[in-house]
């Protein structure tokens, strides 16, 4: 009987750890998606217009890429996903790679260790990028993948150039100051 109690106790400890890991993973996903900006803000027609010069183009690209980076990543991933619908093998590989990215890069709380060596986040990013590119290119959907990446990049750059940056705040302090009414606006 004592052995059964010990086995039961040890088997109950495992689900608690799994539940804790799942809760932590859910929180990290929520935190990651929290950086996504509202699609209404992203596609606000009143905030679009042509830039006034080359410096304005580069300024808008820099600001919009920083502000909408999660949205842009979602757009590019969707373009790639839809381009792979006609290549089921590539789509399966792509889905597996998404899970690999989620667990090895995005949901990792502690530094990755291999054979007692700590792996830097930059090395993980580079390694996962190389693995992703190599595996997807080996699935004979090279043209579709490259075309989808190019189409996604063009869409992102077009949006980044025509989206005005006057109403975007990259830091919390500026957004708080603006929304609290502490800034003065000239009356018209």
Swiss-Prot record:
One GO BP annotation is:
vesicle-mediated transport
Q: Where is the composition biased (Polar residues)?
A: 1-13
Q: Which domain of life is it from?
A: Eukaryota
Record's subcellular location = Endosome membrane
Q: Name one Pfam family in it.
A: PRA1
Question: How is this protein positioned relative to the membrane?
Answer: Multi-pass membrane protein
Q: InterPro entries under this entry?
A: Prenylated_rab_accept_PRA1 (IPR004895)
Name the UniProt key words of this record, in alphabetical order. Answer: Endosome, Membrane, Transmembrane, Transmembrane helix, Transport
The UniProt function text for this chain reads: May be involved in both secretory and endocytic intracellular trafficking in the endosomal/prevacuolar compartments.
Q: What PANTHER family has UniProt attached to this entry? A: PRA1 FAMILY PROTEIN F3-RELATED (PTHR19317:SF61), PRENYLATED RAB ACCEPTOR 1-RELATED (PTHR19317)
What is the protein name stated in its UniProt record? PRA1 family protein F4
What is the species listed in this Swiss-Prot or TrEMBL entry? Arabidopsis thaliana
